[in-house]
Amino acid sequence: MELDHLFLCVGDRGRCGDLLAEFGLREGSGNRHEGQGTANRRFFFRNLMLEILWVEDEEEARSPLTAPMGLWERCGGEEGRSPFGIGLRVQDPEEVLPFPIWEFCPPYLGGRGCIRVGCGAGTEEPLVFCIPAGAGPYGERNASQPKAEVAGAGWVREVELRSKQGVPLSGPLEAVNGLAGFRAFRGDEDLLTLRLGPGPGTRRRCFAPALPLELRW
């Protein structure tokens, strides 16, 4: 089990992604998620994809199929709703995850399996899920996507995820906290920090409040 991608839910139909492009991050292709009601903009680092996610179809996002994901609430900017999602990947499709799950099988996966979603967490904390083996942004279909980098640094060395949630971390989030280079904790703001490059750097760029994202290199 390892990190595959991180999403940030936004309410402006992805326009805040322009901030990343204007900063100089190369952008990959976007997707429309049939049956899920969302669309995205994607930025591919060498080992991790950053996804700007928004709701395009309210009816699909609030349907009985998709509503349990909480994407409508997360992208609506409501106080107390976490905008973050943590996507995991596995090499072995039979690998048992270290937390209880339920299966989300949207049409856009085309029968290539289901997304395994962590149980026990509400929308006040990041959504933890595992994509089907081989179906994520680092599968063969996306091998030629342009890679994002900052000052030549394209490898995400550390991820810090700060959340304003007022509840203890759930089992799925605690399990992800055990991964090397990842740390989730409670704080006074929602903020995702990506540390790039081989060692500690002194430079930073914060895109808040438009986007709860900070890059350090």
Language model region names:
Residues 35-39, 188-190:
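Short acidic/glycine-enriched loop/turn segments that link adjacent beta-strands
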